[in-house]
Amino acid sequence: MGDRNLTPKQFGALGEQYAAAWLEEHGWTTLSRNWHTRYGELDIVMLNPEYTVVFVEVKSRRSMHYGYPQEAITPAKQHNLRKAACDWLLDRRNRVPHTAVRFDVVTIVLRVGRPLVHHIENAF
């Protein structure tokens, strides 16, 4: 955990694995992972116990030295995530009964021992 030998891509994938597992432990169901559109990638799409489709952006860091991980989600990134989410919702393969849609952020600080997980609901 927090292994300095991981590439940035591997490190991000590890953070996404922790985030998905953490949410699944809280009763959520994974619908998609790393879903690509022309607007970018949706890290994780999940269905929570209240039947809300939640688009989860995951930000992983080794420390808080450069600020909070969620600060990396700029207004432009949020705009592209919204467009990507629309594409996901319009894709017939992703039809799932749901009552609402929202965007959450999960930050993971991978440190020695246990990862520090912070879940921000309705982040934007």
Swiss-Prot record:
Lineage top rank: taxon: Bacteria
Coiled-coil region(s): none
InterPro entries in alphabetical order: Restrct_endonuc-II-like, tRNA_endonuc-like_dom_sf, UPF0102_YraN-like
MF-aspect GO terms: nucleic acid binding
NCBIfam families: PRK12497.1-3, PRK12497.3-3, PRK14681.1, YraN family protein
Family: Belongs to the UPF0102 family.
PANTHER family: UPF0102 PROTEIN YRAN
Protein name, entry field: UPF0102 protein Blon_1698/BLIJ_1758
Organism for this UniProt entry: Bifidobacterium longum subsp. infantis (strain ATCC 15697 / DSM 20088 / JCM 1222 / NCTC 11817 / S12)
